[in-house]
Amino acid sequence: MSLRHRTVPPQTGRPLAAEAVGIEEEPYNIIPVNNLLADHPSLRFPEVRAAAAALKTVGDLRRPPYVQWRSHYDLLDWLALFFGFQKDNVRNQREHMVLHLANAQMRLSPPPDNIDSLDSAVVRRFRRKLLANYSSWCSYLGKKSNIWISDRNPDSRRELLYVGLYLLIWGEAANLRFMPECICYIFHNMASELNKILEDCLDENTGQPYLPSLSGENAFLTGVVKPIYDTIQAEIDESKNGTVAHCKWRNYDDINEYFWTDRCFSKLKWPLDLGSNFFKSRGKSVGKTGFVERRTFFYLYRSFDRLWVMLALFLQAAIIVAWEEKPDTSSVTRQLWNALKARDVQVRLLTVFLTWSGMRLLQAVLDAASQYPLVSRETKRHFFRMLMKVIAAAVWIVAFTVLYTNIWKQKRQDRQWSNAATTKIYQFLYAVGAFLVPEILALALFIIPWMRNFLEETNWKIFFALTWWFQGKSFVGRGLREGLVDNIKYSTFWIFVLATKFTFSYFLQVKPMIKPSKLLWNLKDVDYEWHQFYGDSNRFSVALLWLPVVLIYLMDIQIWYAIYSSIVGAVVGLFDHLGEIRDMGQLRLRFQFFASAIQFNLMPEEQLLNARGFGNKFKDGIHRLKLRYGFGRPFKKLESNQVEANKFALIWNEIILAFREEDIVSDREVELLELPKNSWDVTVIRWPCFLLCNELLLALSQARELIDAPDKWLWHKICKNEYRRCAVVEAYDSIKHLLLSIIKVDTEEHSIITVFFQIINQSIQSEQFTKTFRVDLLPKIYETLQKLVGLVNDEETDSGRVVNVLQSLYEIATRQFFIEKKTTEQLSNEGLTPRDPASKLLFQNAIRLPDASNEDFYRQVRRLHTILTSRDSMHSVPVNLEARRRIAFFSNSLFMNMPHAPQVEKMMAFSVLTPYYSEEVVYSKEQLRNETEDGISTLYYLQTIYADEWKNFKERMHREGIKTDSELWTTKLRDLRLWASYRGQTLARTVRGMMYYYRALKMLAFLDSASEMDIREGAQELGSVRNLQGELGGQSDGFVSENDRSSLSRASSSVSTLYKGHEYGTALMKFTYVVACQIYGSQKAKKEPQAEEILYLMKQNEALRIAYVDEVPAGRGETDYYSVLVKYDHQLEKEVEIFRVKLPGPVKLGEGKPENQNHAMIFTRGDAVQTIDMNQDSYFEEALKMRNLLQEYNHYHGIRKPTILGVREHIFTGSVSSLAWFMSAQETSFVTLGQRVLANPLKVRMHYGHPDVFDRFWFLSRGGISKASRVINISEDIFAGFNCTLRGGNVTHHEYIQVGKGRDVGLNQISMFEAKVASGNGEQVLSRDVYRLGHRLDFFRMLSFFYTTVGFFFNTMMVILTVYAFLWGRVYLALSGVEKSALADSTDTNAALGVILNQQFIIQLGLFTALPMIVEWSLEEGFLLAIWNFIRMQIQLSAVFYTFSMGTRAHYFGRTILHGGAKYRATGRGFVVEHKGFTENYRLYARSHFVKAIELGLILIVYASHSPIAKDSLIYIAMTITSWFLVISWIMAPFVFNPSGFDWLKTVYDFEDFMNWIWYQGRISTKSEQSWEKWWYEEQDHLRNTGKAGLFVEIILVLRFFFFQYGIVYQLKIANGSTSLFVYLFSWIYIFAIFVLFLVIQYARDKYSAKAHIRYRLVQFLLIVLAILVIVALLEFTHFSFIDIFTSLLAFIPTGWGILLIAQTQRKWLKNYTIFWNAVVSVARMYDILFGILIMVPVAFLSWMPGFQSMQTRILFNEAFSRGLRIMQIVTGKKSKGDV
């Protein structure tokens, strides 16, 4: 043990410190800071005592008045008494500071001379980092910092006071923590008051020593936090739960950005002026600050105007050039250059600058119109800038227009391109030069990125003046440029993407459209089939022809991005050495270097490899090269006596033990995988059995082949394979030991065996073995030994049989094995025969087999038996796919590049934070037993899906004492529940995974500090994984309670028995796990089962802490709120409260999850915090690499060190259904290849809710790890990434470590998740963060940002719009007669449309989603497997799923931008193999998919019936197949991917349930699941809260349904070919008549149907007669025919739907007219019945078709079938007998 771990004598009775000083014993969190003499492992570190002592240096500071000063008070108490901080806030931050300062001092290299005092450099670095944002804020506002410390005269006590003051403010700021500059303002003023106290200033008013403006109990909370909190709460209340338009209330960002201007000093003052308009929520309040969010698609243009300018200008230029191209026989490039040489073309190309200036004007007008509310008396400059921007843009348009007009005017005058005309062109170009000056300057700064950063980050007013015009003043978004190398990398990427895109667009999109456009443009005398409003002009037709082409043109960069990012991602992955070890076979080849890899990467090395500099990096690279490919002696072989081998054995066996505890390997597999201890005098390293399989047989065959070869040559051949050499030596040594063990020591037989092995050893040493013994006889000896070991291995074997085999072996060895036959006399002389052979049979009474309780002996025998008998390759060990994957990934990761691991003492400390609300903790007995309607229970499902793991679990339980399986429900119920919970998405699974960090750190701390002797003795003592029952280690220290063997704690391990005590303290100092269980207090009060299970988790995991919000009644109907931290005290055997910090009010003002995280954030510790969601998991072997990952913070990635470390994820929910597999594959490619490319080379990786590791203090002072404003921050986690990038952070991605993640597995769950993400992206479009990133990032990073965030969803929506534009355009051309006249035979048009249809189809099929999957599979699993997986996906209808998902994303993204309505959607995390009813599917998908699909299907039918192209079936199919595929996918996907989706009986029941739902007359409390009417009203909620613009756009979009009527009525026979407008107007009489009839029927039903039913029937009869008479009259007196009735349905049903949708938008005033509104509701019900029947018809038909249900089940569960699972039993509900 090192000097660092000086032990403290154990205490007896009351702590010494408590006796001496009288400090009351308080529960502590990690270290008892108030009692430094306690017997606690952490207090053995001198750094802890030094940090605590530093806080005690109050010295001569002026004491606070009015309170009694106690001797044990420290600097934080001093601050609290002066400024009125809460006691528990002080206690919390005291521990926080002590832990951080101690950990920081531990990392000092070299260590300070005096380890018992705190180094001043540690405090200084901490202060600089923590207050960096404050210093930047002061500089930005031009205020002098109130940190009065100079580097020349360091003052550690003053530094500690500043740090302590900031942390105390932050710890009590509650919701204000989301507003970092607000906290800066508070700190600035309080630091000023602190300085006055420290400088002994006098109060100007009283002449007394200066006192803070606020002091006393809870003064800070009530005087500072509460007023600002109340303001936030008032704004939230005004927002009506976020439903009011964003522009009408202030969110967190608005209030925070108020502190970005110096008006906060003049308006707010200090102490806070509560009369300031800042605090007013109504009337003349401050209003929006910094940015105004408005619901409009124009914000996509505002935020990314540079992208749209680029696309618009190229499209314009391409059309101009292509229009002027002269088709000839030359190449396409020659035609292009010839067109460009023409002066007319060159001049027309100048019009792009008119367009550009027009787009600038649009941008300026949008800025002014949307941001006008920001204008106030204090922001006059902002108003002036917006106004001048509009004027300047308008001036440029006028200037360019005049100059351009002059060019053509001069040319027309001169009738040629004269010199005068050329002069006019030059004048235009001079203006262009002036116009482009800002762009040229931007380009120059792009090439020199450090100059741009300098200009933006420098707060000199001259630079503000220079940049004021181009970008508004903003505290964030400055200095975002990357280094030159990164700049070149991502620029090159985008140059290739854009070059490909524009080449493709010109030659395959624009150019083919020119000829048909010219034909249509010049077409005259079109035979229109309706009333034409535009005369003979075909401009509208041309526009419709171009619309789908333009839409695809605008979005197809997304396709090219997907292609290039896949290629680049694969290249980066290859250089990162991903996928080099893909399976157990490849691991087998590298396993001998594996120990060295663990030593190199996971064990700290005392060498200069960590030092900076090119030389050391080069040495490190050489070391890694040797390691990766086994070059050089150090990485070649391990001998059994090496400490390195023993450390490796301890780590490897601990990993295998973790696998066994998780039941992913069996007991037998543990024996095959473990590295056993060095026993039985084996002289080589004892590799795991799965590596030695078949090696002995191969060695024997080599010996047989080389029968005449000398010893040296034979041994050389065997030693070429390390495993073979070890197998031979171990088998020989083990057989020798076995024979000598089972034969009694004092017998002649023992002596004979000893002599025989001496002879063999002598022959080996003298290299005479092949000359002494018959090598050809070895197989016979081998077979005999096999029998012998087999008999010994059988614990019930009769010793007589063993004697017989030994006698046979003796005969072979003595009579046949020697080359020179020996006589009996020679054998006797050599001691190989008994002295009196005739007295007894040899071995008769000499055998003594060890007792069956000798587990170690028989374990070694089993191993020997395995080495002797294994003839297969054992590639199937372990059997479990998850175990194989984890071993392969872990082993591969150790050959990847990663920082070296420091000692645990010197590593960065970190926390894990998990937000939890009310999800499952542990499955209850009832949940496991309850069955679905198909008779399937959760446990049965898990037994079926995880059959091998269930078998392993039962094996473990039987080993622990159960006799029958029924005992699992009694004595082992807890184990059973945990086993099931670990296979769901439960909190128990997450906690188990995270606590592996603690277990790993304890083991690594032991290995760090253990001496060579400790390691060797430990390996001898343990060596193998003997303790499979998981008893808890280290209990002598009193930190882990005595628990049963089924403990959920992961502290249990074989290595833990070697711990010396300090490992626990070290691990606790470095790791804390906080679960933010927001409502745990109320769950306890209500005695909910979740509370009991959470307590159980705390009981089993000593590093686990629970943070919750406690609501305490305060009288008068008021409630006090507290942030509380609790733990389980194993000595008191109860839950104890550690800290209780009072809050200003309810936590949840904004979005729930970030508010939950924020309140618990004050209880986290360390330099980093990892955000883990409730559906995530981790693994022991991955936890070993955490300290390597944290070292990344010390390395530069580009020009900055990281602030977020991205971590790879493994999706663990894709193992059964094809749907789960599709989602898993999509997510896997996103979280691996996608994130890899975003981080390198694109440098735009954000935080997407992954298990990323945050630089805790960096984020602590910059707003936290998420944003919480209501609705706008619905995707709360991604805003942490936005905020990080905007504030100059750096996000990286690391794939040598991974965690598990669960995903939704049912279509409805997946759809809700997609809806949530799409809605979140819709809100992001409106946000200030996206706007600032769109403007502040350089051009190429802006492109990366757009196409990987909101652009992806926008482009998905564009694909859907393309389908609409294409089909509506074709219908227009068909119904108008234009298609018949001009385009029916236009092959050019079809070619152009074919290109865009193909592109649309590529996206629709999910191919651009699938491409990254294929590439990632190729990289990590192999190319052939990737192709096979892709083919399987297509066979299993993945294209249907991706097309359906595309519709979900497009619907919710578009609707959120237009109307809002984004909300958290609970997707559920259960196991989905149950059938979902038709009603549920209809409710979920009616508006997002079904209605749209029916509309598109109707368009296709109308087009087919009226288009001349439809007569050519091949052309029609080619043009509409993609659209029909979309229609079918949107209608059928919910049934294709629904278990038993085509079961006839279920279909019948579903339809009955649907009709009941439609006609259900609900009450007030009715839910939408019960009543159609309730659901129908809920579906309109977004229209209730939308603005006038949203309603206007909605009505405009609805007008398309009236086009059906306009187009079709002219096709009716009754129209008689007339094209008069009156035909259309008369058709409305039909609509009006139907509506009147409907009102009459409704009136009659309401009045007569109940009491006078005969009258109701009479009215119906009269109306039917009237209708018949009208039809007869029409047949008699007009050209009406019966076919018109059916044709008119295609016209009038869409019209009715359109009227209905418009009525919904006018619901507010229509509801005042009850009869009309009731009619609207009734009509809506009829339409939903119609839609339901239309959807049900194909489902019913397929259900009726024989064999289709079986085929659907096979498609949906093919993955399970291929694994041999009993999936049919799950689907059909037929259990097999004997299931638990």
UniProtKB/Swiss-Prot annotation:
Question: What is this protein's gene name?
Answer: CALS12
UniProt family annotation = Belongs to the glycosyltransferase 48 family.
Q: Which reaction does it catalyse?
A: [(1->3)-beta-D-glucosyl](n) + UDP-alpha-D-glucose = [(1->3)-beta-D-glucosyl](n+1) + UDP + H(+)
Report the transmembrane regions from the record: 303-323, 349-369, 387-407, 428-448, 490-510, 543-563, 1349-1369, 1395-1415, 1422-1442, 1490-1510, 1517-1537, 1589-1609, 1621-1641, 1658-1678, 1682-1702, 1729-1749
- What EC number(s) are associated with this protein in UniProt? 2.4.1.34
User: What is the name attached to this protein's record?
Assistant: Callose synthase 12
Q: Which residues lie toward the Cytoplasmic compartment?
A: 1-302, 370-386, 449-489, 564-1348, 1416-1421, 1511-1516, 1610-1620, 1679-1681, 1750-1780
Q: Which GO terms describe its molecular function?
A: 1,3-beta-D-glucan synthase activity
